A protein has these predicted regions:
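Bacterial N-terminal signal peptides
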Residues: 10-21
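Carbohydrate-interacting regions of secretory-pathway proteins
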Residues: 28-281, 285-293, 298-307, 311, ...
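Short, well-structured beta-strand segments within conserved domains
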Residues: 105-110, 178-184, 234, 248, ...
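Short tyrosine-centred short linear motifs in exposed loops/low-complexity segments
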Residues: 115, 314-320, 328, 368-370, ...
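Beta-strand-rich ligand-recognition modules
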Residues: 165-166, 217-218, 229-230, 346-378, ...
């Protein structure tokens, strides 16, 4: 039975009585918008989530892969990680017990040198897993590629077709964990007739979008199934090469929400607020298909009331995300006299935003089927062209979808093309602000190299804090208009390094490493000098010791070598001086002598015969430190960052 839509009188009464208290944005400080509903997780304590397979698959506690030795992957005792080591006798694929259509998937993957595997959506459409470290021009067969299709009947040399290479090579070194996200939409059928091809909306590798809106006309090569259907199992290839997988999370989508019988009433004028909705006749009214502020026909000082029916596909908990973009951080741009928005479902309050913040979220349990829907909002500002209202819904089997008209948002907005900076034939040094771990760094030099290896260096700490390959910097927030945020951001796949000074004096071996430099008597930044190629060497003074810090890419453009040269005058105290090579939750020495940092997110390697660093625990983290040993007043510390 259809539920009646709430009348405007009932909405006004709820507002007047102050009963809209489900989520009240005025009762709490402004905060960032909360995350989407959590995904499903595949428990890797055993293989029960998968169909029976061969002995090449097992559950392990971790995996170690060799950067140098091809196909060398070792499983470590425990649970939480899938490890595949195929043999001639055992090389089966791994298929989930459940099937999917539309799917958002994320997982971590580790590959040894030269290894090859794949993730097959519905057992048919492959995203390639491959050791592509250092590849300059990736193809469909490289990490993150959508693999080609194959047809023997096309003739010799023409069998392979389609296939889409990743937009950029965002892969990491063998033996490091890599993060992969896939947003996939299944083919559509009307009866037995296919009416739409399968599509990869996005493939994101290590934080970089490498595929976007790629259509696949049929199963890719080596698929388990050659036909196409509405659903199929998720498959990880087992017969090509060793691979380890962990942290498998997914959202499977089976339905959609719908607004229907949607009507609106609109008001505009000086001093507008919610009382206008119950005390004055509307200036405009009508029917629409989706939510928008456009029918108000005003940029400032307007109010709207929507009423209609919301249909959801199944019973469960649904999350609503409501945003009114005219609420700002300044006092004149926020508060109950400037803005308010109320979401009401079945006559009950779900969200109230009294102008304290732009975005508010709330969860509500709904039965499957139809529900009375109401949304009211007003803007009472005399300047500023912001008037966008957005409302998203997400729930069981329901992809996060807009209930507003997104096409009108584009018309309201002013799209900005990203402002990019690249290094072409010579290095680039760009000074800017840059965000790091929630803090805006203001003494940053970002350095791009034509070889494709880049880093950001904090001159106030004398240390690099980001390294990456691929595109260099996106500077829109610096150079568009007034440059409101005044910050740049790395455009490639970023590795986060230590958040601390690189060179420090410790009073004893257990003293805490400083997290910043605040005493200019202990640290003085002295700028940088450029070599003949245009690459900088950063200069500083630490406890009277002159420090020269040079970071240089290797000839292949895949690693970054760092050389820290220290010169101590006779008057300087040099006992207790250390260089921090790395810092993270965990630092572990590997069989090849390198050190894996932060759960194998990057490696630190030292030259053969170099002094050995020490790993110590400090405040819940681990540090890789090298005591400085001077010879005739000079010392050099050299190591490489591998990712």
């Amino acid at each position: 039975m259809r539920r009646p839509s709430p009348s405007l009188l009932s909405i006004g009464a709820l507002i007047a009585l102050g009963l809209l208290g489900a989520v009240d944005a005025a009762a709490q400080p402004a905060r960032p918008e909360r995350a989407d509903l959590p995904p499903n997780t595949i428990a890797l304590t055993d293989l029960r989530a998968f169909r029976p397979t061969s002995a090449n698959w097992r559950v392990a506690g971790d995996a170690t892969a060799d950067r140098v030795r091809p196909l060398a992957l070792v499983a470590e005792p425990g649970t939480g990680v899938l490890v595949n080591v195929p043999t001639d006798a055992a090389k089966g694929h791994l298929l989930t017990t459940w099937e999917h259509g539309d799917l958002d998937l994320s997982l971590d993957v580790m590959l040894p040198k030269t290894s090859n595997s794949g993730v097959y959506l519905m057992g048919r459409y492959e995203v390639q897993l491959f050791d592509s470290w250092g590849v300059k021009t990736p193809t469909f067969a490289d990490m993150g590629g959508i693999y080609q299709r194959w047809d023997e009947s096309r003739g010799a040399g023409q069998q392979g077709y389609e296939g889409t290479p990743p937009a950029v090579n965002a892969s990491r070194a063998p033996g490091l964990w890599q993060h992969l996200e896939i947003s996939f939409r299944a083919p559509r059928f009307e009866g037995k007739k296919k009416v739409a091809n399968a599509r990869f909306l996005r493939v994101v590798l290590n934080g970089v979008t490498v595929q976007e809106n790629v259509e696949v006309t049929g199963p890719t090569r080596a698929a388990l199934f050659t036909d196409e259907r509405a659903t199929g199992p998720l498959m990880i290839q087992g017969d090509h090469g060793p691979v380890a997988v962990r942290n498998i999370e997914y959202k499977s989508y089976t339905g959609a929400a719908k607004l229907s019988d949607l009507t609106y009433k609109a008001w505009s004028g000086e001093g507008i607020d919610t009382t206008w909705m119950t005390t004055r006749p509307p200036m405009r009214e009508g029917s629409v298909a989706m939510l928008s502020s456009a029918p108000a026909a005003a940029t400032n000082r307007f109010a709207m009331a929507y009423a209609g029916t919301l249909t959801v596909p199944t019973a469960g908990r649904y999350r609503f995300s409501l945003n009114i973009d005219w609420v700002g951080t300044e006092a004149a741009m926020q508060g109950p006299t400037v803005a308010r928005a109320d979401l009401i479902i079945d006559g009950k309050p779900v969200i109230v935003n009294r102008g304290a913040q732009q975005g508010t979220q709330a969860d509500v349990d709904l039965t499957g089927g139809k529900h009375a829907f109401a949304l009211t909002f007003f803007k009472n500002r005399q300047w500023g062209d912001q008037r966008d209202v957005t409302l998203f819904i997400e729930g069981p089997g329901l992809e996060k979808q807009p209930l507003h008209d997104e096409s009108l948002l584009a018309a309201f907005g002013n799209p900005i093309n990203p402002i990019m900076v690249q290094a072409s034939t010579e290095p680039v040094v760009l000074r800017s602000f840059e965000w790091h771990r929630g803090q805006k760094r203001v003494y940053v030099a970002s350095v791009a190299d034509p070889l494709g290896v880049h880093y950001s260096y904090d001159l106030s700490r004398g240390a690099p804090f980001y390294v990456w390959r691929g595109p260099f910097l996106e500077t829109t927030q610096m150079w568009d208009g007034r440059g409101e945020d005044q910050s740049s951001r790395p455009a490639g796949s970023v590795v986060d390094l230590a958040d601390a000074p690189a060179v420090a004096y410790l009073s004893d071996a257990n003293a805490a490493w400083p997290d910043s430099v605040i005493d200019e008597k202990e640290f003085r930044r002295n700028g940088y000098v450029l070599d003949k190629a245009g690459r900088p060497t950063f200069l500083s003074t630490v406890h009277g010791v002159a420090v020269e810090d040079a970071l240089r890419p290797d000839a292949d453009g895949i690693t970054l070598h760092r050389t820290v040269h220290l010169r101590a005058p006779a008057s300087a105290s040099v006992d207790g001086l250390y260089v921090q090579l790395a810092q993270g939750k965990h630092v572990a020495k590997q069989a090849d002598g390198s050190y894996a940092v932060d759960d194998k997110s990057y490696l630190v390697t030292l030259p053969s015969g170099a002094a050995q660093p020490v790993v110590r625990q400090q405040s819940g983290r681990e540090e890789l430190l090298l005591p400085v040993r001077f010879d005739r007043g000079e010392s050099t510390v050299a190591y490489s960052i591998v990712w």
